[in-house]
Amino acid sequence: MEPPQETNRPFSTLDNRSGQVQVLSATPLLQRNPYSSPDIMHIKGSEASSVPYALNQGTTALPKNKNQEGTGHRLLNMLRKTLKESDSEELEITQETPNLVPFGDVVGCLGIHIKNCRHFMPKISLQHYANLFIRISINKAVKCTKMCSLLSKNDEKNTVIKFDEVKYFSVQVPRRYDDKRNNILLELIQYDNREKRAFLLGSVQIHLYEVIQKGCFIEEVQVLHGNIFVCRLEVEFMFSYGNFGYGFSHQLKPLQKITEPSMFMNLAPPPERTDPVTKVITPQTVEYPAFLSPDLNVTVGTPAVQSSNQPSVVRLEKLQQQPRERLEKMKKEYRNLNTWIDKANYLESILMPKLEHKDSEETNIDEASENTKSNHPEEELENIVGVDIPLVNEEAETTANELLDNDSEKGLTIPTLNQSDQDNSTADASKNDESTPSPTEVHSLCTISNQETIKAGRIPPLGERQSESMPDRKMKNVFFPLEVKLKDNYPSILKADSSLSEVAFSPKEYNSPSFRPEYIEFKPKFQFQKFNKNGFDPFLRNINKMSVRKRKDQDIYKYRNILGAEVIEHEDQDPPYPAQSKTAGPANTTWAHDPNIFTTKMLETENKLAPDPTINTIKGLDTKNSLKENLPNVSLPSIKGESSRAGNVQANTCHLSKSLNFTPHIEYLKQSMILKSILSENLQDLSDKLFSKPEVSMNSEAREKSSSPLLSIHDKSSSSMEDNVLEKKQDLNNWLSEKDILNSKTTLSQIIKNIPADSFSEGSQIIENIPADSLLEGGQVIKNIPEYSLSEGGQIIKNIPADSFLESGPGQSPEVEEHVSKKHFEADERDFPIKKNSSTKKKHLISEVPNSKSGSSGTVHDYIMRQIFTAPIFSELEIEVKEPSETPMNLENQLPTPWKRSLSSHILFHEENADEIELPQPRSATSQIIQAFPIDTLLESGIIKVIELDKEHHKSSLLGTGITSPKGNLKDSQEYYSEIRSETEPLSEQSIPIIPKDTTSVSRAEFIQEDQNMFPQDSSYYSIANKELYLPRNGQRLCKDKNDLSSTLESLTNSLMDKLSESDEIMLKSFLKNIFNVFFKYNHSERRGQPEKELERLIQPSFTSDTEHLEELQEDFDKADKLDRKPILSPKLRVFLEELSESEVKHLKSELSKQIQHYLVERLSESGHITKEDLPKIYQNLYLMNEKAEQKGPNSFQGKYSETVKEIMSFVNNFNHHFIDKHLEIKLRSFLKEILQNYFLKNISESSLFNETASETIYPNISSLRTKSVSISFHELEQDISKGSFGRRFEINMKYPLSKSLQNYLIALSENELLHLKADLSKHLQSLFIEKLSKSGLMTKKQLEGINQHINLLNSSSIPLKYIKTHLPFRDDCHFVEKHSEKQNKYSRIVQQTTLQTVSEDKLREAELIREKEKKYFPLQNLKGNSSLIKEQKSYYTKEEAKTPSLIKVQPSSNENIQASPLSKSSEILTDILLKKLRKEHVFTQLPQAENSVHKTEIQDPYSWGGKSKITQSKAWCEKTLKMKSLDRKEHVNIYKWTVQEKPEAVLTSYPRIPNARMPREDEYLNRITFPSWQSSTLTHFNTETGEKSKLEDQYCQTLKGNNNNNKKHLVTFAQYKKEIQTLYIKPDEICSEKCAKFPEIQSFQYKVVEDEKNLKPHLFPELFKIEDLKPKVRKERDRVAQPKKSFNKIVRILPTTLPTTRIHLKKSVPRTLLHWTARRTIHDCSDKFEDLHDMTSFTHLKKVKSRSRLLGKSSDDIHNHARHSARPYTAPEVNKQRESYSGKFTSRRMVSSGLVHINDKTSDYEMHKMRPKKIKRGY
């Protein structure tokens, strides 16, 4: 849409431009201009604004150009140049430049200058005149103006709101006028500070085309709300082509004309910066921008070569400004994204937030309420935070307007985000620095963080917060854009802050317990991804990113309103979460301090926790932060006080929770759904990051992410520790005095009564976290803890407690810890007593661990963790650990939701994480990975169970079982297991984390961490031997992890299902699955990498015989596993293991062995037994050991195997070359793969692959076993395959066939063995294909029987047939057939090929002649045997369809067997080979004569597919042929081929319908001509049964055509042969179609045929040969054909004469094919159409074709065959007789299908012959 030149006129005038330039100069668009260098930017920015005036005022404006390098004089020169430059010069310049190449859509720069609003409707109240802004939406781009208020509110009529803002859009100009992208939407929106939401007052829509046509204009539009007038809006529109409005567009013509009217001023470049060629300004070097990370090494704008005369680097003020904190966070988020798609989405979400009016409005309201509440705390926080908050406020104030504009454009809510982030970081820093900040400070920080969190949750709230700091107006200005970006950026900030940032968010959520948790949930886990994923359309473009959070915020605000001032005050009181997150330790302490608040948050979060447990934790952290502030010095006693305090807080929280309860669960569910989707991505990313990071903290984070339920209790490093833990457990029980228990019960009961179940679960989580934090006096641990740990507040706490314990644990006496834990437990009990206890206990354990990790607390913690982790177990734990079991049960009922599992798991996991951080012994990747795995999963998998102490394994298995089992079962099992664990405390501690599988994952990770005290992994807890055991367990765990995860997911989902909708459950499941998959994959990769080698290396030095030792160890482990599994493995695990196939078990074992090796190596290295320098050697040794182990036993085996594998691989590769049909190739490949896999798997299983993997020494045995069981296994495989029962074992072990051992085995196989294998495979394939066909309904029982007979015949006569085939080097056809046969039967094919190759052509010809004679007799015999059938077919011709199947079945009996083999692949190949041989014999026999060769080729085509039918028809023909001596052989050949064709036809119908389809075509040609009834029946049969196959064949033929366009002859032969060989192939149909297409073009076809005959006489000869049979002239003609056109014409003449007789027969059969071919005269058309017809129900098509062919028989055929052709058929009656025999042959199914035969009774026959040559040509 190129606007008229007028459009550009306004811009051409400086006056017009001047005004616009001013506006444009400040716009970011200018800065973005790719063409603009820093200089240009300055010129356009500072200069541009002044230039317009400079033009009018002279040089007065020049001084304003401060950024300009030159002086005012320089600018004047530039302006003069620009103004004085003549058009001619411009023209010359433009002529010099090459024309732009059109590319992409037309683009342009649209400038919209929003001037003012006036003439407001009187009805509008004055209140609506405040905080108004215009939102401009074009396509997906959304930009907002600053917020403005009415200048005059006294006189409504004269009220004017001046915006005076210009927004630029780079727009694509759609080609269609009605394209919705052409709509420019201007919306007048008012932001309500009180409600914190935006309201749409009115809107107006303008069409882009109008703007383009007018170019530049000012228009006053009416803003309407529906049909109600609101006001008048004065807008100036400017449009200029080119992305940046410079008139450059690849679709606009003269450059000079385009540049003239640029939207921006055109200034002549300074002489020193003018390019001499293009006369454009050269780029200017700019200093490296401060906002770009130095590591990026950005070179854009820097000259490649510094020239001496180049000016110094330009310093731009803007570029020197340090980036805001948000930018760094965003960078981190961006860099953390793994895929370009994610990165693009992330950037798009920032730059182009989606519109979501309602959400943004709601969010705004919520934010406003929160902001008002938290204004003072925010201010305090800002003060505490220091620079950050003030910075944000100042920026908001100073840049409120600009930033809003820029932010809205650029998504710059950085100030707000910075504020929250900075606040968080500052607060954290201050808290950490102060360790015990004054309560006031802490409180203020906490409050601010909460407010910020809330704001972040609703991105607008952040803006609000800023706005609160600054005037409301500014806040309004910033609010929308900030809100949008805050949402997106805030999560990123949180991520950047890691745990702190997450914590910060949770406080915000905590501020509005129910609401905050919801959006917090989104933020903590998806801080960054959240806005990427949640590209919700905020009310404003900036608000767009707020969508999810805004919704939550809105909901939260609503809920807050419901909650009332008390709840709001409580939230406000919470320390700002961001600050707390930074002061992780204090936040935790605060949590411990305010359990009530936590409970409230938890309640809210619980509802939201189901979606995002992390949010709950975060809230807890906020509370902890506030508590820490209150209790700067968190001592155990203080913690106790805090816990009691928390109880008080809980009371408040209960109120909040009540109010939260008011919030509809539907809202929670919705939020949870959003959270789930976000969390799934975030967790995946986090898990990836965690897995990638070897740090323990990362592991804990990863565990948290992978599954917050990963409550892995760290096993104490010593059994004594376990004893201590057990003692502690008892002590904890003792600690929980009856009074405490009663108190906790009462508190819990009250809380439960007051607080919703969800809030309860949340509270428990928070409480758990609080005790941990309180235990961690420093709260610094939180700082150290990664975001991931923060993602789950509990996780952060985990990390913190570990540090705190490490820091204060040694000093703290176990009693104090016990006391504290007791109090915490009570406090937690109030929220969720058991959880609190578990967290406290855990922390105590951690603290004690430094002291000696008294087992009692650890045990108690583990026990509690187990209970908590198992949602149902939670209540049990409470019952067991706490008297208030009823309350826990209530909580459990509430917790069963994802919140429950995730909360408990998170709490425990976090605490354990703290322990893990405290004891980050497992530095190795393997140990970390193992730690990351859920203990339950490990135990269930048997990795930990076997490896760890028997008790521990038993416990863990029990725990795992409990987790796996339903909730009730879990409770019972967990109780039982917890008891067992308490008994086997150390082990139980490790295995205690049995909670839901998510929880289990966490527990496992934690367990590893605790183990780290002893060993990085669970096995580390044990001695090195134990470690070795552990490694196998790890392998098992890895293998079983998924199963465990699935069971865990199921249990989790079961618990969640209560509260979550199906969609939520599904989302959670997928999320957990993704997390676990990523986690386990990572673990697998890490563990598999070097651990095995390391272990083996370790074993080698440590043991005399490393391999033997490993084997022994593995055997011992296996025994131990067997012994331990029964008692240790949970029932589900046992069932799972029992269900595992041997191969799967072996896989598991091998993985375990590798894991054990890796683990042992790591453990040894960690324990100092092995030095880092030794590790590489050890790994190498292990690797060598594995290799040796594989080679020792299986040396010969491997050699044979490798040979076999190589053979197979070469065979498969050959498949690719020869299989033109991709479908067939894929099927064959998969089939072979299955067979090989089954075979090898069986052999491998017999040879104990498991041991092989575990101790590579097994390989020798395996090799022998494999060798022994090769034949047997193959037979079994064949049976299985034929039965179609490959079993999942087969699928699971798909890798085995490709394993080195398999390859070695194959390589080692002798040729004989390989041949046997191949033969078995071929037979297998044949039977399998047949069975599959029959099962799939492609083959009828009769056909199947016939095929079976054929297969039997092939098997019996496969050798001679193969021998004949070997002889048949039918150029392309034979070669292809041979190749194909090779694919199907490598051995037979290879032998045949070699034979064929070895035999010289003369010998081949002689052999062919002999074979021809034999075949003549043989086919004749077959025909005799089937003669009745053939005759019957003729007689049944009317019943074509019915009889054809029978005939096909009967005829195939002998020949079909051959084709049956091809169907079974090997037999098919044999059949093809035989057919080829026969064809070759015929062809070779006739090759000397052109006619003979042509005839033979023709025969071959039908012979390959239609040849069988030809043979069948050739009984009578044989007689006729015998009558004609010259044609005798040919006739025999034809007959034989016909028979062959019929066989393939039967075969095709039975199995490869596609080949049948092709077969029917040739056969139809032959049959319809000579034996129309039989042929037609065959065709009908084919069409009915092989309609689908015919389609495939057509496709295949097309493929062949495309592949072999250069060898049409070869293609015909090849296609025919392939059709015969590959009943599955589509070529036959295609060939037929090709032939049919050729028929219409008889002359061209004749030429082609002649050429084909020359090139491939055998291929083309079949039809020519038929002609020869018709007359000796045909032979001469064919000889001539070898001469080209003359002979062909003669042949054509002869063909018509012979065709008439067959025509009559063909009429019946031809009609179907005729329709197909009649419509398609061109070869391509015919083939395509024919294929299409075949694609359709072939039977119906046949009928239609019949009718058409009968109608066309006289006319259509003539049309196809041309007049002369139609005449010739009538002219040669004698030939017609011959034609009948030959035409019958000639009218192969292909011809019939192509409809060539039945064009006309006489003419159609003649035409059929003509078309047939064409067909051959086409079939090439």
Swiss-Prot record:
Biased composition (Polar residues): 415-443
Annotated localization: Cell projection, Cilium, Flagellum membrane
InterPro entries noted in UniProt: C2_dom, CTSRT, CTSRT_C2
Region annotation Disordered: where it falls in the sequence: 360-383, 403-443, 695-722, 838-857
Predominant location category: membrane
Gene Ontology BP term (one): sperm capacitation
GO cellular-component term (any): CatSper complex
Keyword Cell membrane in record: yes
Assembly: Component of the CatSper complex or CatSpermasome composed of the core pore-forming members CATSPER1, CATSPER2, CATSPER3 and CATSPER4 as well as auxiliary members CATSPERB, CATSPERG, CATSPERD, CATSPERE, CATSPERZ, C2CD6/CATSPERT, TMEM249, TMEM262 and EFCAB9. HSPA1 may be an additional auxiliary complex member. The core complex members CATSPER1, CATSPER2, CATSPER3 and CATSPER4 form a heterotetrameric channel.
Function: Auxiliary component of the CatSper complex, a complex involved in sperm cell hyperactivation. Sperm cell hyperactivation is needed for sperm motility which is essential late in the preparation of sperm for fertilization. Required for CatSper complex targeting and trafficking into the quadrilinear nanodomains. Targets the preassembled CatSper complexes to elongating flagella, where it links the channel-carrying vesicles and motor proteins.
Known disease link: Spermatogenic failure 68: An autosomal recessive male infertility disorder characterized by globozoospermia. Affected individuals have a normal sperm count, but spermatozoa are round-headed and lack the acrosome. In addition to pure globozoospermia, some patients have a mixture of acrosomeless spermatozoa and spermatozoa with small or detached acrosomes, which is defined as acrosomal hypoplasia.
Protein name listed in UniProt: Cation channel sperm-associated targeting subunit tau
